[in-house]
Amino acid sequence: RDYYASRGLGDVYKRQVIDNRLVNVISFRQNKGIKEPLYCGELYIDAENNALVQARLEINPAYVRQATDMFIERKTRKWKITAQEVVYTISYRQWNGIYYMNHIRGDLYFKVKLKRQWFSSSSLHTWFEMVTCKVDTDNVTRFQRKERMPTRTIFSDTHFKYDADFWGEFNVIPWEEELGTVIEKLSSKIEQIEY
């Protein structure tokens, strides 16, 4: 079954510059006949070496409400939660001729409404972000099974040993500081840690 369609060449393929490099931007969306929540978005491919340098994905806005159960693991009886928008941005950076994951950000927007109340809805925006501080390819091994968590785990139900002193002054990153500057400072902190 063909889930995705490409539009006319003018709509699908564009060119843009990312990190001083020319990239081809390829847009994709699901076929009109498909009525389930699939992803749509853009892939940013380096024009010179065909490497994927960035991707922007989102649940098709027309069907994002149907995807609510994908993101809500446990529901309460008092509240109704509906997905409004789900967007992911992933970027890759070249290091020693190989592209590695550099930055991930996910933005999830929900409408939250108290059941049996007419005018009680509000918006909830939750997001996550990960930035690669250091790439180390020496002696890389997979995580052991006991070190992995099931994908459906609810973090607030999990008991972790948290070292409040580990991050030191970086425990909270101020909004006004640029993320790249903070990562540089944080990288030097990580370099000091002995294993």
Name what the model sees in each region.
Residues 2-9, 13:
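Single conserved hydrophobic/aromatic residue that forms the stacking wall/gate
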Residues 8-9, 97, 148, 167:
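Short linear sequence elements within intrinsically disordered, low-complexity coil regions
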Residues 11, 23-138:
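Gly/Pro-enriched, hydrophobic low-complexity segments
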Residues 19-20:
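Short acidic/glycine-enriched loop/turn segments that link adjacent beta-strands
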Residues 107-195:
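Secretory-pathway-linked proteins and extracytosolic
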